């Protein structure tokens, strides 16, 4: 079966934020997501679009098709402002982080749609633990072959994105020692993790057809790779990032993803020779980013030497400066040095906990990240 790829000639953007719905009195997750979804469906005049997720304490908001990061900012600012008002009227609140610091997955309720029931029936324990939250960034691609080649390349830089965004050190009240606990929870699903490398779109089609014909997946939506093609949207979708505390971090990561995607697209279109890392090195780098975030080292994709993660990200951001100016996202990319200086979300959560000895205080700080 041929899988058509809807062309997007411009490097358009779309961003999805998975958010935690909490009880302001306790800071714990609350299964009020379906209530918010229903309200928004019944009152389209409000202008807020909220999507359900597997766990009822989760909702997703997203942008439309955006021409640049500035439009992403406008879309998300509008959606977050509307969401604050709707939540306030219902006595709930929301925050953004890769995991909740102390919520227990056994207490979760699940969305009872055929799709989500099938997900839990198939993945059982691994699916029921999915109280995890990510940030997904789409970038438009002109065709499937280009999308595949850009994914092959940007996957080598995905660990840097994870290190910057890592924001899930706690799980059920324990410090896991990881900067991104979400990463390891998510990898347990059957088709999650780093993407496979393909020579072209046909190679991707061949794999998807086998998985469909054997009942391994019901649709392409069940391919949960860290970076995947989205044929219906005509995009690549970068999914490796933890949900970040603030909108400013979302926009900085979006800018970096767009720059990398356009950079590698042009290399491919210009026929330039592209070096591909061994998958084992990419896997090692992903582990290092998951474990140590910005505090460790990554293997440099060019020199194959261990380099401090901060330095490697600084170099990469520096190489993207002229492209960022062309794309109009320089101001957003300029926020990344501040993240490198102050630390990622996991560092901040641990700092708050060290000062307060209270995970409720950590939740309050996370909630404040999107409060205005």
Curated annotation (Swiss-Prot):
It catalyses: L-cysteine + L-glutamate + ATP = gamma-L-glutamyl-L-cysteine + ADP + phosphate + H(+). One of its GO terms (biological process) is modified amino acid biosynthetic process. GO terms for molecular function: ATP binding; glutamate-cysteine ligase activity; ligase activity, forming carbon-nitrogen bonds. It is an enzyme of class 6 (ligase). The keyword Ubl conjugation does not apply. Gene3D superfamilies: 3.30.590.20. InterPro entries: GCL_type2/YbdK_subfam, GCS2, Gln_synth/guanido_kin_cat_dom, YbdK. Keywords: ATP-binding, Ligase, Nucleotide-binding. Its EC number is 6.3.2.2. Coiled coil: none annotated. The keyword Phosphoprotein does not apply. PANTHER family: GLUTAMATE--CYSTEINE LIGASE 2-RELATED. Belongs to the glutamate--cysteine ligase type 2 family. YbdK subfamily. HAMAP family: Glu_cys_ligase_2. ATP-dependent carboxylate-amine ligase which exhibits weak glutamate--cysteine ligase activity. This is Putative glutamate--cysteine ligase 2.
């Amino acid at each position: 079966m041929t899988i058509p790829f809807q062309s997007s000639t411009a490097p358009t953007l779309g961003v999805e934020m998975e958010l935690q719905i909490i009880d302001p009195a306790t800071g714990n997750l609350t299964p009020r997501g379906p209530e918010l979804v229903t309200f928004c469906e019944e009152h389209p005049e409000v202008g807020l679009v909220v999507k359900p997720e597997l766990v009822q304490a989760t909702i997703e908001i997203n942008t439309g098709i955006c021409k640049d990061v500035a439009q992403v900012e406008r879309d998300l600012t509008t959606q977050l402002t509307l969401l604050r008002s709707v939540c306030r009227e219902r006595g709930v609140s929301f925050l953004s982080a890769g995991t909740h610091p102390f919520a227990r997955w056994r207490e979760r309720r699940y969305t009872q749609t055929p799709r989500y029931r099938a997900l839990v029936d198939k993945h059982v324990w691994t699916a029921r633990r999915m109280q995890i939250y990510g940030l997904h960034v789409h970038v438009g691609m002109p065709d499937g072959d280009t999308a595949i080649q850009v994914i092959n390349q940007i996957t080598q830089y995905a660990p840097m994105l994870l290190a910057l965004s890592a924001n899930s050190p706690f799980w059920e009240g324990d410090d896991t020692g990881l900067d991104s606990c979400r990463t390891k929870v998510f990898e347990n699903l059957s088709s999650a993790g780093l993407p496979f490398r393909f020579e072209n779109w046909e190679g991707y089609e061949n794999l998807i057809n086998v998985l469909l014909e054997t009942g391994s997946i019901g649709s392409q939506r069940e391919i949960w790779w860290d970076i995947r093609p989205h044929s219906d949207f005509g995009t690549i979708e970068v999914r490796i990032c933890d949900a970040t505390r603030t909108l400013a971090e979302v926009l900085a990561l979006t800018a970096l993803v767009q720059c990398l995607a356009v950079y590698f697209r042009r290399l491919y279109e210009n026929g330039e020779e592209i070096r591909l890392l061994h998958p084992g090195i990419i896997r090692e780098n992903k582990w290092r980013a998951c474990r140590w975030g910005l505090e460790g080292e990554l293997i440099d994709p060019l020199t194959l030497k261990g380099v401090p993660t901060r330095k490697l990200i600084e170099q990469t951001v520096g190489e993207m400066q002229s492209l960022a100016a062309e794309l109009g996202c320089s101001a957003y990319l300029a926020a990344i040095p501040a993240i490198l200086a102050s630390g990622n979300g996991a560092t901040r959560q641990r700092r708050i906990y060290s000062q307060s000895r209270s995970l409720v205080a950590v939740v309050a700080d996370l909630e404040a990240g999107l409060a205005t």
